[in-house]
Amino acid sequence: MTKSTLFLFLCFGSITVSAQDNILKTLDSPIIFKGNDSTAYRDPALLFHENTFYLFFTLVKSESDNKVYSYTAMSTSNDLKNWSDKKILTPRDQNLDFSSPGNVVRYNDEWILCLQTYPRPDYYVKDMPKFGTGDARLFIMRSKDLESWSSPELLKVKGLDVSERDMGRMIDPYLLEDKDQKGKWWCFYKQNGVSMSYTYDFKNWTYFGHTESGENVSVLRENDEYILIHSPKNGIAIKKSKDFKTWTDFGRLITLGQKKWPWAKGRISAGTAVNLKDNPQYERYVMFFHGSGPLTEEEGDFDKNASIGITWSKDLLHWEWLK
């Protein structure tokens, strides 16, 4: 290698590293998708695959018939600033209102997305807010390419011998492979705090138990332990466990810049994180969440004025965000 070639290599190499290090710093807003008086973006679910962010979320729309509909939708980005057109994945049906995607996992030769129904029949704008009925259940959808998705399939997480009617109201699913036993998959979901069931084939499920928790659970698997991220009445909290039986609170309640964010003044919730600390473009945990406001959810900013935001951290304790 000549001196001139070496000089060019070093120069361009340093430029590349610098550009990679600045991905998060190039963002100009803490808001990824901004809600308004007729639209809410809620419940983000995140997959980082081949340097692309796949963002799944609840899209709530007040439509021309003055009814309120919920959908599961998705968008993709390579830089967290430029996002593809939002693509709706589920049908327009208030008796189902598929929503709250939990995450996407790779199983055999396909991708599996978990989500819920949140039935709200005859829901009109004038009725805001209205919460889902007791018929809410858990489902999965399958894909070969992360673009085309199958019809939803019911998850009988209480076991095949428990009828759908007797399963009880359940929302906010999240899937995770066991840290010790490959091929064993867990489903976390909101029922009696957070409940847990496991399977080896996504058809036959065994109920495991439950523990105290908020909603919108997501779980990381690191250093021989599980890191559970959940949402109490306001903010985001974290627990840790090695066995799903004994849980220890970790850190303080995460509320980020809520005091200065009118768009999240009502509530911050639904945090979900991906560990990109080993990726030179990010070197952080990257967390998505939703914020609603300025009203609280009970005051009406539940199916409107809800936005998806972003924050990041080196250690899950100290968080950085744009002002």
Write out the residue ranges for each language-model feature.
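Bacterial Sec-dependent N-terminal signal peptides
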Residues: 1-21
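Carbohydrate-active catalytic/glycan-binding domains of CAZyme proteins
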Residues: 19-323
